[in-house]
Amino acid sequence: MRTTYMAKPNEVERKWYVVDAEGQTLGRLASEVASILRGKHKPTFTPHVDTGDHVIVLNASKIQLTGNKLQDKIYYRHTNHPGGLKQTKAQDMRANKPERMLELAIKGMLPKNTLGRKQGMKLHVYAGSEHNHHAQKPEAYELRG
């Protein structure tokens, strides 16, 4: 009888990928990056083991939103004080913290558990086209969509 392959944490080989977000749609880019972070693009994918790769996302400030989402979409956060609900429009978020906008979209597509938080730490988002991970020799990743 054959058994299903289960990757072991010490056997996993990690690569570094660079993704250019310029002109990409937020949700479509986020779903592909989340898939890479989880390791679903590998034949050795195992749901309970972190088999994913590191992803560097560049040009987060040039991400696109479809329709009227740039004016209508609202991001909420709470200060944990009474009456401390804060809201930010997507337009302001893209102008002030474009990295945060992309991080929220990608991390929202990862599992909500310890493994998902560990996978989310392999995400590196930059607003501009420069990054400081040249020592890891990242390779360009061509998006499917």
Curated annotation (Swiss-Prot):
Top-level taxonomic group: Bacteria
UniProtKB keywords: Ribonucleoprotein, Ribosomal protein
Gene Ontology cellular component annotations, sorted alphabetically: cytosolic large ribosomal subunit
GO molecular function annotation: mRNA binding; structural constituent of ribosome
Pfam families linked: Ribosomal_L13 (PF00572)
NCBIfam families hit by this protein: rplM_bact (TIGR01066)
PANTHER family: LARGE RIBOSOMAL SUBUNIT PROTEIN UL13M, RIBOSOMAL PROTEIN L13
Function noted in UniProt: This protein is one of the early assembly proteins of the 50S ribosomal subunit, although it is not seen to bind rRNA by itself. It is important during the early stages of 50S assembly.
Assembly with partners or alone: Part of the 50S ribosomal subunit.
Family of this protein: Belongs to the universal ribosomal protein uL13 family.
Protein name: Large ribosomal subunit protein uL13
